[in-house]
């Protein structure tokens, strides 16, 4: 009897040890630390980057900042490991998840929400049901049904329903974005967060991703299409940007089709704003009058209160920025733009001080006098 008990105990112990090892292996397999480089090695000036910290500390609610150049971290500020809510950055990540399923035909962008059986608590008008999946992911559906979560259309700027034809007007509308999430699950059969884990987090080697933190959220009495909030650390946000910079390729694997990366970061809705030249497929497209060459082709995921993932193809650079929920204050879009300019300035060649002018040689008075006398003698 004792022998049997010992045998059973040994068997159970082996099973438990195996499970623990498997769990540890999965965690290690997920974690893939970033390589690090000195700013000078990639042509950036370290002293100028330090101005970012000075500005952020004195003026913003920045809690984490990562600057990646040529695939290596060259500068960090704050706690880059802290995982927190990333607000509307979720929409750009959803665009990335859409990529392969659009390219392989699983998701058809010309399908209408009526054909997909999409409806909502207040009911959708026949005209609204003509909006396509493409309209949803470009914020041009013309459907102004209340969203399950705040954000998007300002409270003081309501649009009349049934007036705007789909595809004709850009309105940043959370209803569109949330329904795009519903469509993703409906067409792929995948939970958004499971897809996030298997298609992005694991292959990217995210260091801080936690599937358990991710749950749909919103007021189902307002709309049955809930928001797919996402939570990342700043250093893992940088991985998302780096994947886009690399045209969707990571460690030899094409995680997001290159054609989708190009398409989603091209202008769909032109915008005449100081910092935005347009909106693509769930990505903001940037410009800057002060540094037009450095900002050429730049685009960004942007979330309320200071959540940003910005890609600079011209500089082979990614900037990830966060103002976490515990920040005493938030970071405005204007403040973030100033941070980006400080980083760009650090990439500019160091100006050489002008060469000192040769001092004019003043002749000695004794030397001048005889010459003057000679001249007078003539």
Residue spans for each PLM region:
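Active-site-proximal loop and beta-strand segments within enzyme catalytic domains
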Residues: 35-37, 47-51, 99-172
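Active-site helix/loop module of the DD-peptidase/beta-lactamase fold
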Residues: 103-139, 188-227
């Amino acid at each position: 009897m004792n022998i049997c008990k010992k045998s059973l105990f040994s068997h159970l112990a082996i099973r438990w040890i195996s499970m623990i090892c498997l769990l540890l292996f999965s965690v290690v397999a997920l974690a893939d630390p970033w390589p690090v480089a000195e700013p000078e090695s990639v042509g950036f000036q370290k002293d100028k980057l330090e101005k970012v910290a000075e500005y952020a500390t004195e003026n913003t609610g920045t809690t984490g900042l990562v600057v990646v150049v040529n695939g290596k971290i060259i500068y960090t500020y704050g706690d880059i490991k802290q995982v927190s809510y990333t607000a509307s950055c979720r929409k750009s990540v959803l665009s990335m998840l859409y990529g392969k399923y659009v390219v392989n035909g699983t998701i058809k962008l010309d399908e209408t929400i009526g054909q997909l059986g999409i409806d909502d608590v207040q009911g959708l008008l026949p005209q609204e049901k003509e909006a396509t999946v493409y309209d949803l992911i470009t914020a041009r559906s013309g459907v102004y049904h209340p969203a399950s979560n705040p954000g998007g259309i300002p409270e003081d700027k309501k649009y009349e329903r049934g007036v705007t034809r789909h595809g004709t007007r850009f309105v940043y509308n959370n209803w569109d974005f949330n329904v795009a999430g519903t469509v993703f699950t409906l067409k792929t059969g995948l939970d958004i967060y499971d897809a996030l884990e298997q298609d992005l987090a694991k292959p990217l080697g995210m260091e801080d991703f936690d599937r358990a933190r991710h749950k749909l959220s919103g007021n189902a009495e307002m709309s049955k299409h809930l928001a797919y909030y996402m939570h990342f650390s700043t250093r893992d946000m940088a991985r998302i940007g780096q994947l886009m910079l690399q045209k969707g390729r990571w460690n030899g694997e094409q995680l997001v089709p290159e054609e989708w990366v190009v398409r989603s970061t091209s202008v769909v809705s032109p915008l005449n704003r100081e910092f935005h030249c347009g909106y693509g497929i769930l990505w903001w497209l940037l410009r800057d009058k002060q540094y037009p060459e450095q900002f050429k082709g730049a685009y960004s995921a942007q979330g309320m209160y200071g959540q940003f993932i910005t890609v600079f193809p011209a500089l082979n650079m990614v900037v990830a920025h966060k103002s976490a929920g515990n920040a005493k204050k938030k970071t405005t879009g204007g403040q973030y733009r100033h941070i980006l300019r400080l980083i760009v300035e650090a990439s500019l060649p160091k100006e050489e001080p002008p060469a000192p002018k040769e001092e004019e040689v003043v002749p000695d008075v004794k030397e001048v006098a005889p010459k003057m006398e000679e001249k007078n003698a003539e």
